[in-house]
A protein has these predicted regions:
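N-terminal beta-propeller domains
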Residues: 1-97, 143-232, 317-339
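Repeated scaffold domains used in trafficking and secretory/extracellular systems
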Residues: 66-75, 103-117, 149-170, 204-212, ...
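Hydrophobic beta-strand segments of well-ordered beta-sheets in folded domains
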Residues: 80-81, 117-119, 312-315
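Pre-catalytic or accessory/regulatory segments outside the catalytic core
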Residues: 83-84, 89-122
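Short acidic-glycine loop/turn motifs at beta-strand connectors
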Residues: 85, 92-95, 123-125, 130-133, ...
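Beta-propeller fold detector
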Residues: 98-103, 137-150, 194-199, 236-242, ...
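Hydrophobic or amphipathic alpha-helical targeting/insertion segments
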Residues: 111-149
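Beta-sheet-dominated scaffold domains
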Residues: 205-340
Length: 340
């Protein structure tokens, strides 16, 4: 489309089928009986184009620089915006009002989770908890002797500080930490301590994603997606949910109502077979894009839920190692139309 204005975009018939790059080039397009440009239900490719529910195109406004620097690991939690910029963990009410709260590794991806009104963060080396003031967590290793009254007999249990991991999550009153091929979980309602002799699961490979869904949790590794089914980790079952590995860091959460479930939000992610999926509370993984969008294998990525001007959509940025990111395009509109 040669630089159309917004009025021209809105007057088009639109593409009610959305973006679809899996349709055959020879597929017969329906005659809509109009002289408007679209003569197919599908767009094959779109750059900075939003589509309404009816398929009408809108111009996406591109991007604007908020703050210069090597930035990654963006997170929004408890009404605050978190990001790592040039080795500084920055926090603020929005991207234009940030203050530094910690010095962290410049390159390691940061994982975040909210728990009991605080935001916890960890990258495998640096970790902490942010409330109104910064508190170190989990800190130096310590041991705790805790006594419990069970049947009038005192039992000594050795508790230790939770390990520092590269990925963390909070679910069912416990903190979960992923380190290499091990998934650790804290004591109930005690997110800083665990029994390292019992409070863990062994994983088949390096975990990149921990995402709660209902009483369970999805675990994404290099080789597949697993679902930990059950609220009590001591009786929970670890089941295989999807046979392809997660694209590292390419996951986010969306409102559960979009998938007719009662959860406030559920996880969505990209896997290495080029498919976006949602993890439902039952442990079912539902593919969202396989029948209409084919994506090549990517090395890493990022996702975010974008809600603007009445449109709610998941925005993904996917890259191969060393490839330039073409998701941040300038203010332009490009659409590829198949004519028959």
């Amino acid at each position: 489309l040669p630089t159309p204005n917004d009025d021209k975009l809105l007057r088009m018939d639109g593409w009610p089928g959305g973006v679809n790059n899996r349709i055959r080039e020879t597929e017969q397009a329906s005659d809509r009986g109009t002289d408007s440009i679209p003569n197919s239900a599908f767009l094959r490719r779109a750059l900075n184009v939003d589509l309404t529910t009816e398929g009408h195109p809108l111009r996406r406004r591109g991007y604007a620089l908020a703050q210069a620097g090597y930035a990654h690991s963006v997170f929004n939690g408890n009404g605050l915006f978190f990001v790592v910029i040039d080795g500084a963990l920055m926090v603020g009410p929005k991207s234009s009002e940030l203050v530094q709260v910690a010095t962290v590794n410049k390159y390691l991806r940061m994982s975040y989770t909210t728990h009991a009104g605080a935001v916890y963060y960890s990258n495998g080396v640096d970790s902490g908890r942010y409330t109104t003031t910064l508190e170190v967590w989990p800190g130096p290793d310590q041991e705790y002797d805790i006594h419990t009254d069970e049947d009038l007999e005192l039992a000594d249990n050795l508790y230790e500080t939770m390990p520092i991991g590269h990925v963390i999550a909070s679910n069912n009153g416990r903190m979960w930490v992923g380190t290499r091929d091990t998934l650790w979980f804290s004591e109930g309602m005690s997110p800083h301590i665990c029994r390292r002799s019992t409070n863990y699961f062994m994983l088949p490979s390096y975990p990149y994603m921990l995402q709660p869904s209902g009483d369970g949790m999805y675990i994404g590794t290099e080789t597949g997606i697993s679902f930990l089914k059950g609220a009590d980790p001591f009786t929970a079952e670890l089941e295989g949910a999807y046979s392809y590995g997660i694209v590292p860091f390419a996951f986010t959460r969306v409102p559960g109502r979009r998938f007719e479930v009662e959860e406030d939000d559920v996880p969505v992610w990209w896997t290495r077979d080029g498919v976006m999926s949602v993890g439902l509370p039952s442990g079912e993984v539902r593919q969202l894009t396989r029948d209409r969008l084919a994506a090549p294998e990517y090395g890493f990525g990022a996702m975010s839920l974008r809600e603007r001007e009445g449109i709610s959509q998941v925005v993904s940025s996917l890259q191969k190692g060393g490839d330039a990111n073409n998701m941040g395009a300038s203010d332009s509109v490009v659409a590829e139309i198949r004519r028959c």
